[in-house]
C-alpha cells in the first residue's frame, strides 16, 4: 500500500490546477453564475489559522457550487493601503510599498499552499496604480454630484497614529487600531455625504433576507433614526435662537435649563465677557475627558453657566443656558432642552447645579414629588402641568404636541439620524491621493479624469508630524491648474482605506481594464455577490460604506443593482488559550507549520470540523491530531479497497443480501445529509461527521465480510461517491483518489454526487419489544408488516414467552416501525 505523504500530493495537485488553469473563470458561460467572495485581507505580515478559517469556508462554497454546475467567480486580493505600512516605514526605515509587497508575497504563498480555488488572474491590490486610479475616479463621481465636500469640522484625532478617525473608527473613546484615547481637533476635512442615503440604507436592510439579523440590527442602530420635533428657544436679549431636536416634545413644559455641547460655536457667541476666562478653563478640562465616556449615564456631569438665559417658547419662562460635558456636537443639534424630571442625565446635572425639577409626566397610579425624587421618571404616563395637554396620555401627547407646535410656528416635525457624513481625509502618505487641486484664481478644481491616477511619489519623508507627508513634498504639491494653467497646489491628504474596500468587489470583474473601472455588462452579469463571507467586526464600517457606494454608482447609471451582497455569512473566531490570536499574546498558530506537519487537507478539515463555522472555537492540538488520524484511516481504507474496484464500474449493480442493501442505504442517506448540511446553512462540521460515519460503515463491512464475498460494484460506488463528497473539504486527497481510481479527468471538474431516493427506502426494520415497561427483546421484520403478523411473530419468540409465562395479555401496543409494548 502506498504511503500518505500529504506535502508531495498537495504540491503535485496544486501545480496541475495552476498549469491547467482549472479555476480561471470565463466572463460568460451557459451555466448559471455564482460569485463567492471572502473579505480580502490587510497584508500586515503572515496569516494565522484564524484568517485561514475565512478562506477555507469560502473555498468549500466555491468548490461545491462548481460541482453543482455553476460558473463560479472566486477571486482574491489585498486591502493594501493603510497605517501599519507607514508605521513600519517610520520604525524600521522600510518604504511602505516595499513592506506591503513583501507581505503580499508571503500571504499569496500561504494561501496557495492551502489549495484554495482562487482565480489568480484576477488578483488585485488596492495600492496598485491600476486600482487606485479608479478609487480616485469614484471620488470624482461623488464630487461632481455634490456627494463629496470639504468643511471645517471637529474631528476625532489619534495622537499616536497622528491622523483623524471617522466616528466608526472610535470605540469607547479610543482609536480602534491602537487603543489610544482620542482627542478633538478642528480641521478642514473631506467628507462623503452618506447622510443623503440614510433612509435608503435603513429601509433596504429589509431586502437583505440573506443577511444575519444581528448584523442588520447593528447597521440600524448605527444609522439611528429618530422621529421627533425641532424647536427654537429664543435667547433673551438677542436675535439668536437655540435649536434643539427632541424625541420627547411631550416634556416641553418641564424644560428648566438649556445645555450646549462644549464644541458648539454658540458657546463663544453667548458667554458673558466676564466669564470668558473661566469658560476657557472649563473647556480645556472637558477636552481632556474621554468624549464618549463623558456622555454615559454613570459619568460625572459637569457644566458651566454662560450667564445667559433662553425663553421656553411654550411657557415663556426664563431658563439658564449651560455648557455641559455630556452633550456631543454630533448628536442632534449639539444643544439639548434639559428636562430633569424625565431624563436621568438631566436629573443628575440639575441636582448638582441646583436647577429646578418640574414634573410634567406622571405615572397612571401615583403622583411624583420633585423634592423627593431620587431618579428621573422616564416612562410613559399622563401629561400634567402641560397647559392645554393636561390629562393627555404621553404616548398620544408626542404626536399632538408636534401638530400644535407646527400650528403655532414654534417648531416642526423632524427626522434625525445618528449617522454622520463619512470623514474620508487622512493625514498620511500610504493611501490613495484625493484628486483635487487648489488654484487661487479658480478655487477648488477636480483633477480631470484623463489625468488620473494622481500618483503617490516614492521619495517621501515619513515624519510623524500630524500633517500628511505629501504636504512636505514640493514635487507632488506644486502643479498647474487644469482650468487656467496657473500655479496651483494639490490636496495632500489621502483617502480613508475604507474607500478602497468600498468597491473592490466590482473591480474583480475586470481587474486589468485600463479605460474604465469595470465593464457595465460584465459587472451587471456577475453582481451582486451571491455569497459574501467575513468577520462580524465589519458589520458597520465596511458593509455600510460598500452599500452606500453601490447605491451611488447605481443612481449614476453605472450599475443595475443597488445592494452589493445578496447573502452574508459571518464566521466565528478561532481562539488559543482562551484568547484571540495575536503576536503580542504569543498564541498564534501558523498554518505553515500545520501544513508542514499534517498537510493542508488535515488543516482544512480540522478548521471546519472544530465547531459550526459561525461559532467561535478553541484551537486544540489534540483535535487536529484526531482529524489527521481519520485522514490516514481513510487513506488506508481507500487503498485496501482500490485493487478490488480499479477495473470495476457501477453498471448493473446487484445487491445480494440485506447487509449490502443496508450499506448502500447508508451511503445514499449520508450523501443526502452532506448535501443538505452544505445547502442548509453551512453545517460543515456535521457534513464532515457524515464523511467519517461513511468511512466507519465501509470499514465495518470490509472487516465483517470475507474478501471473496465483497460486492465490488457496490464498493466502487462507495469510494467514488466518497471521493466526490470529500473533494470540497480535502481537495488534494480527493484528486489523488480520483486519479488512482483510473480517471483521466480531475475530480474538481466532476458533478456533485447524487443520491438515489430508492436506495433510501428501508425494507426491514428492527423493532424493540417492551414487556411491562422494560425492553426484553428485539426483532427484525419487513417494514410494511401488519400488526397481526407482527403479533404472531413476537409472541412465538422464546424471550417473550419467558416473560409472558402464560399470563393473560392485557394490552399489545405497536408503534409502527419502532416498538411493541406488551402489558401482562
Swiss-Prot record:
One MF annotation (Gene Ontology) recorded for this entry: ATP binding
Motif 'KMSKS' region location, chain numbering: 580-584
Reactions mediated catalytically: tRNA(Leu) + L-leucine + ATP = L-leucyl-tRNA(Leu) + AMP + diphosphate
Disulfide bridges in this chain: none
GO CC terms in record: cytosol
Subcellular localization: Cytoplasm
EC number: 6.1.1.4
Gene Ontology process terms (BP): leucyl-tRNA aminoacylation
Record's keyword terms, sorted: Aminoacyl-tRNA synthetase, ATP-binding, Cytoplasm, Ligase, Nucleotide-binding, Protein biosynthesis
Residue stretches in coiled coil: none
PROSITE patterns with a match to the protein in the record: AA_TRNA_LIGASE_I (PS00178)
Primary location class: cytoplasm
InterPro entries hit by this protein: aa-tRNA-synth_I_CS, aa-tRNA-synth_Ia, Leu-tRNA-ligase, Leu_tRNA-synth_edit, M/V/L/I-tRNA-synth_anticd-bd, Methionyl/Leucyl_tRNA_Synth, Rossmann-like_a/b/a_fold, tRNAsynth_Ia_anticodon-bd
Residues where ATP binds: 583
CDD domains named among the record's database cross-references: Anticodon_Ia_Leu_BEm, LeuRS_core
Pfam families to which the protein is assigned, alphabetical: Anticodon_1 (PF08264), tRNA-synt_1 (PF00133), tRNA-synt_1_2 (PF13603), tRNA-synt_1g (PF09334)
Motif ('HIGH' region): 41-51
EC top class named in words: ligase
Keyword Signal part of the UniProt annotation: no
PANTHER family for this protein: LEUCINE--TRNA LIGASE, MITOCHONDRIAL (PTHR43740:SF2), LEUCYL-TRNA SYNTHETASE (PTHR43740)
Family classification: Belongs to the class-I aminoacyl-tRNA synthetase family.
Protein's recorded name: Leucine--tRNA ligase
Lineage: Bacteria, Thermotogati, Thermotogota, Thermotogae, Thermotogales
Amino acid at each position: 500500500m502506498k504511503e500518505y505523504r500529504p506535502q508531495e500530493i498537495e504540491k503535485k495537485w496544486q501545480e496541475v490546477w495552476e498549469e491547467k488553469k482549472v479555476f480561471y473563470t470565463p466572463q460568460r458561460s451557459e451555466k448559471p453564475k455564482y460569485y463567492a467572495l471572502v473579505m480580502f485581507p490587510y497584508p500586515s505580515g503572515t496569516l494565522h489559522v484564524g484568517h485561514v478559517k475565512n478562506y477555507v469556508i469560502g473555498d468549500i462554497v466555491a468548490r461545491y457550487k462548481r460541482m453543482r454546475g455553476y460558473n463560479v467567480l472566486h477571486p482574491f486580493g489585498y486591502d493594501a493601503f493603510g497605517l501599519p505600512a507607514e508605521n513600519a516605514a517610520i520604525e524600521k526605515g522600510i518604504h511602505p510599498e516595499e513592506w506591503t509587497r513583501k507581505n503580499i508575497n508571503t500571504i499569496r504563498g500561504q494561501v496557495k499552499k492551502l489549495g484554495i480555488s482562487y482565480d489568480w488572474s484576477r488578483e488585485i491590490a488596492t495600492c496598485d496604480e491600476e486600482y487606485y486610479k479608479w478609487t480616485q475616479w469614484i471620488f470624482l463621481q461623488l464630487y461632481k454630484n455634490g456627494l463629496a465636500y470639504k468643511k471645517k469640522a471637529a474631528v476625532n484625532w489619534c495622537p499616536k497614529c497622528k491622523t483623524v478617525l471617522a466616528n466608526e473608527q472610535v470605540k469607547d473613546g479610543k482609536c480602534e487600531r491602537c487603543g489610544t484615547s482620542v482627542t478633538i481637533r478642528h480641521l478642514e476635512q473631506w467628507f462623503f455625504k452618506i447622510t443623503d442615503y440614510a433612509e435608503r440604507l435603513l429601509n433596504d436592510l429589509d431586502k437583505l433576507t440573506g443577511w444575519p439579523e444581528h448584523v442588520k440590527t447593528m447597521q440600524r442602530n448605527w444609522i439611528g433614526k429618530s422621529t421627533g420635533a425641532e424647536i427654537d428657544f429664543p435667547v433673551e436679549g438677542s436675535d439668536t435662537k437655540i435649536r434643539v431636536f427632541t424625541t420627547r416634545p411631550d416634556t416641553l413644559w418641564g424644560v428648566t435649563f438649556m445645555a450646549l455641547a462644549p464644541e458648539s460655536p454658540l458657546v463663544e457667541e453667548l458667554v458673558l465677557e466676564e466669564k470668558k476666562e473661566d469658560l476657557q478653563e472649563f473647556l480645556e478640562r472637558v477636552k481632556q475627558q474621554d468624549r464618549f465616556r463623558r456622555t454615559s449615564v454613570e459619568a460625572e456631569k459637569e457644566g458651566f453657566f454662560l450667564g445667559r438665559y433662553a425663553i421656553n417658547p411654550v411657557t415663556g419662562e426664563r431658563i439658564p443656558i449651560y455648557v455641559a460635558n455630556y452633550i456631543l456636537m454630533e448628536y442632534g443639534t449639539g444643544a439639548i432642552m434639559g428636562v430633569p424630571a424625565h431624563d436621568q442625565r438631566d436629573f443628575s446635572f440639575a441636582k448638582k447645579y441646583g436647577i429646578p425639577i418640574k414634573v410634567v409626566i406622571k405615572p397612571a397610579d401615583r403622583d411624583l414629588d420633585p423634592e423627593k425624587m431620587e431618579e428621573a421618571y422616564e416612562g410613559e404616563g399622563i401629561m400634567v402641568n402641560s397647559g392645554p395637554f393636561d390629562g393627555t396620555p404621553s404616548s398620544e401627547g408626542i404626536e399632538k404636541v408636534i401638530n400644535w407646535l407646527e400650528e403655532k410656528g414654534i417648531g416642526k416635525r423632524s427626522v434625525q439620524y445618528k449617522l454622520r457624513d463619512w470623514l474620508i481625509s487622512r493625514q498620511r502618505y500610504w493611501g490613495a491621493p484625493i484628486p483635487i487641486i487648489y488654484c487661487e484664481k479658480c478655487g477648488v478644481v477636480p483633477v480631470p479624469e484623463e489625468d488620473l491616477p494622481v500618483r503617490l511619489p516614492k521619495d517621501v519623508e515619513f515624519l510623524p508630524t500630524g500633517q500628511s507627508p505629501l504636504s512636505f513634498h514640493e514635487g507632488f504639491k506644486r502643479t498647474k491648474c487644469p482650468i487656467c494653467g496657473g500655479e496651483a497646489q494639490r490636496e495632500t491628504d489621502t483617502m480613508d482605506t475604507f474607500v478602497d474596500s468600498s468597491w473592490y468587489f466590482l473591480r474583480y470583474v475586470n481587474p486589468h481594464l485600463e479605460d474604465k473601472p469595470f465593464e457595465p455588462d460584465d459587472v451587471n452579469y456577475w453582481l451582486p455577490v451571491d455569497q459574501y463571507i467575513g468577520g462580524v467586526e465589519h458589520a458597520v464600517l465596511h458593509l455600510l460604506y460598500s452599500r452606500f457606494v453601490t447605491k451611488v454608482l447605481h443612481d449614476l447609471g453605472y450599475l443595475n443593482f443597488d445592494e452589493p451582497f445578496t447573502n452574508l455569512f459571518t464566521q466565528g473566531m478561532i481562539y488559543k488559550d482562551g484568547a484571540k490570536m495575536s503576536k503580542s499574546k504569543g498564541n498564534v498558530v501558523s498554518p505553515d507549520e500545520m501544513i508542514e506537519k499534517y498537510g493542508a487537507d488535515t488543516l482544512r478539515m480540522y478548521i471546519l470540523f472544530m465547531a459550526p463555522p459561525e461559532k467561535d472555537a478553541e484551537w486544540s492540538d489534540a483535535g487536529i491530531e484526531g482529524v489527521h488520524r481519520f485522514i490516514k484511516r481513510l487513506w488506508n481504507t481507500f487503498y485496501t479497497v482500490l485493487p478490488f474496484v480499479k477495473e470495476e464500474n457501477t453498471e448493473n449493480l446487484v445487491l445480494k443480501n440485506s447487509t449490502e442493501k443496508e450499506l448502500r442505504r447508508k451511503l445514499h442517506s449520508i450523501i443526502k445529509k452532506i448535501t443538505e448540511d452544505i445547502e442548509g446553512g453551512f453545517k460543515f462540521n456535521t457534513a464532515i461527521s457524515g464523511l467519517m460515519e461513511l468511512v466507519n460503515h465501509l470499514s465495518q463491512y470490509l472487516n465483517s465480510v470475507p474478501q471473496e464475498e465483497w460486492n465490488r460494484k457496490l464498493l466502487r460506488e462507495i469510494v467514488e461517491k466518497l471521493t466526490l463528497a470529500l473533494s470540497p473539504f480535502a481537495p488534494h486527497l480527493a484528486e489523488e483518489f480520483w486519479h488512482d481510481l483510473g480517471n483521466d479527468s480531475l475530480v474538481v471538474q466532476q458533478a456533485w454526487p447524487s443520491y438515489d431516493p430508492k436506495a433510501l427506502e428501508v425494507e426491514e426494520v428492527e423493532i424493540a419489544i417492551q414487556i411491562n415497561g422494560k425492553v426484553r427483546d428485539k426483532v427484525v421484520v419487513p417494514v410494511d408488516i401488519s400488526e397481526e403478523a407482527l403479533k404472531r411473530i413476537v409472541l412465538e419468540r422464546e424471550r417473550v414467552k419467558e416473560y409472558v409465562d402464560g399470563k393473560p395479555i392485557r394490552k399489545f401496543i405497536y408503534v409502527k416501525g419502532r416498538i411493541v409494548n406488551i402489558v401482562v
